[in-house]
Amino acid sequence: YSMAHTALQVANRIIELGRSKHPPQYYTPMQLLKLVYIAHGWTLGICATPLITEQVEAWKYGPVIPDLYQHVKKYGSSSIFDEKLGNFWNSQSAEFSKDEDAILNYVIDTYGSIDGIQLSQITHASGTPWSATFRNGWGDVIPTDLIAHHYRQLLEKVRSNVRTTT
């Protein structure tokens, strides 16, 4: 168990883990924004602690972490081939615990090959924390406990599926 990270640190860890897959995975800004959010959600659902220090906002196309958006928007819709986002000062690599890496790898293996548009649809479908928060505006904060509750429910679904198939 460790302290929460900045969204930038989590994004850089996802980039690093993605590159180490066979074949390597590279992500567009939209994918990366959603993967960080999903990893934050699963961490809340499984460990009951946040993965990132920042709050998540409900934007038109789903949940967004504004600081991370500022770092990735320059890539447009292209894949990010850089090894790291940010600069020397804000991209210092963080220590990730075994549990955190396990969750990040699960998220990459489960969602990493899904394109940004589909990930966006998944994260702002009805019944999601985004849909409960978004009100035709920008920047409403999605309450962390709402995200935690949503991913706890998903976790229960996964667990009951495992029970019925084994």
Could you describe each region identified by the protein language model?
Residues 1-166:
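Domain-edge interaction signal
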